[in-house]
């Protein structure tokens, strides 16, 4: 069993895919979950807790979350809703500070397609620009993006055009990540994350 440690930050279905992949890669996993989105289990949690905004405006990060980030070998952001699953975690001051100082490899997993109402029309470049604008101290060591057949279904454009990563200082890791249900395949994502953790080139 691996003794490596990972932290996954996000919420909703995207975080569930990451959490399904990570046990194949590391021996210890901490999930830092936002409930700011409006769907799935995190949305139900938010409704049950009657939470509509962050109070206080500058919340204090839990020591457990900060400690997990400090001890991590791998930190994974996404996939998931950019503004309601990924960014809320980064805006908590203690989390942002811990991420900036982390010794771990920090990875952003891009979505497979656009999201109506929140990210429609946003390219992968737009996602990375938004991360930089909202979390300027964040250091990304790698961006993981799907390269292969486009997701079927609702006809929304994909967000993972490899051309969006040309010229970026962050390492681009392209792989076929699509499962049979138009989501990220945990086994494929695990292989990519294991390669990043092990320092394998792309």
Short names for language-model regions:
Residues 89-96, 122-127:
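Charged helix-capping and loop-helix junction motifs
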Residues 28, 34-53, 192-199:
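Electropositive, gly/pro-rich neighborhoods at or near active sites that engage anionic ligands
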Residues 121-202:
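C-terminal functional extensions of proteins
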Residues 80-92, 153-157:
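Glycine/threonine-rich flexible loop motifs
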Residues 30-36, 105-112, 141-148:
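Short internal beta-strands
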Residues 27, 102-106, 170:
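A short helix->loop->beta-strand "cap" motif at the edges of active sites that frequently abuts
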Residues 1-6, 20-23, 56, 60, ...:
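Non-transmembrane, aqueous-exposed alpha-helical and coiled segments at domain scale
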């Amino acid at each position: 069993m691996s003794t490596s440690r990972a932290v996954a930050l996000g919420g909703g279905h995207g975080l569930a895919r990451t959490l399904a992949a990570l046990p194949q890669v590391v021996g210890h996993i901490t999930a830092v979950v936002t409930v700011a989105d409006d769907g799935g289990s995190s949305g139900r949690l938010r409704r049950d807790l009657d939470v509509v905004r962050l109070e206080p405006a500058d919340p204090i990060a839990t020591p457990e979350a900060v400690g997990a980030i400090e001890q991590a070998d791998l930190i994974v952001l996404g996939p998931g809703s950019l503004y309601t699953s990924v960014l809320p975690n980064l805006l908590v001051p203690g989390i942002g500070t811990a991420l900036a100082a982390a010794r771990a490899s920090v990875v952003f997993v891009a979505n497979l397609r656009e999201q109506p109402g929140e990210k429609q029309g946003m390219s992968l470049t737009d996602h990375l620009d938004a991360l930089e604008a909202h979390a300027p101290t964040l250091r990304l060591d790698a961006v993981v993006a799907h390269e292969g057949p486009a997701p079927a279904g609702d006809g929304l454009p994909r967000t993972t055009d490899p051309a969006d990563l040309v010229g970026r200082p962050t390492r681009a890791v392209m792989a076929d990540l699509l499962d049979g249900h138009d989501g990220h395949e945990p086994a494929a994502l695990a292989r990519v994350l294991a390669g990043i953790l092990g320092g394998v080139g792309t």
